[in-house]
Amino acid sequence: VKSIILAGAIALAFTLFATPAFIWLFKRVGWGQFVREDGPKSHHTKRGTPTMGGIAIILGAVLAVFGAKLFNGEPISNSALLVLFMMVGLGLVGFIDDFIKTHRQRSLGLSGWAKIFGQGVVAVAFAVMALQLKDADGWSPASGSISVVRDTNIDLLAWGPVVGLILVVLWIYFLVAATSNGVNIADGLDGLATGSSAMAIGAYAVIGFWQFNQSCFRDPLIQNCYEVKDSLDLAVVASAVVGSLIGFLWWNTSPAQIFMGDTGSLGLGGALAALAILTRTELLLIPIGGLFVIVTGSVIIQRVYFKLTKWKTGTGKRVFLMSPLHHHFELKGWEQITIVVRFWLIGALCVLSGVGMFYLEWTYA
């Protein structure tokens, strides 16, 4: 418990007090936000605002995890390192994307295929390590089963060592790509992705701590125990990321003095996916990350409807004034802060529903 609290406190203090230094540095090197001309007019004032703030978020979380574990004289588990690897790895993909945007002053950084490739490399490496890094008893951080609140009977590795491994890797890649892109899409208004990510990842601090107290590895006689490796360390990492986000939000709230950029959104989405995979709650991501599902769904609906109507009538039509959904409400005249707070409320309800499902499953299992 001390490690959970300490990690969150260290990360919060780091981003709260160090982010101004990053703002100054990014202004000096010219890492400012590029704003599309066809976007909402209110966004034009954001041009030049320092971006790549995800560096501060990720660095704060990593330092906090290592600092908390070192202070308490505890080793860092493979599971914790895997989540940090995912966050740093996808953060690096986002950094390259951000760097190209700021250096060339355009809205397109990495091409779509290049970003998919980068996400794929990190996801595949994570999947292989999560399956192969076994302890003395043969337990690995991840399993080959699809999970909801715990592992189901759908074991992908049952298809054989080769086909099964390929299926697991593809499944993990899908989760990582969907989650990281979902957070990335939500990062369109000051503080929206920061606050929403803090709530969603915070759910895994609660889940990890609960799994630790009900762990089969601590006492196999516990009713409805969880076969999750290093669940307490997963809670520590989640707490560190949440602390880092809260400190960053002080500077990212409207009017934002710094943006997280793709460095932050892809890294945070990766951390969220990794926590879900290692806590064996993969499909619980749908309610916990419900806000990200909604905004991503709005983009998919917009594109599909436009292409269908263009194919049928020759003229593409749109469901929303603009996608993602938060921009639709901007164009309808809502204030940005109103949209952000209301979306936070939706995100909070989604997180509460997900955590509620997790607890109810344990209660009635």
Which residues are covered by each model-predicted region?
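Short, amphipathic alpha-helical segments
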Residues: 83, 104-115, 140, 161-164
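Membrane-interface loops
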Residues: 23-40
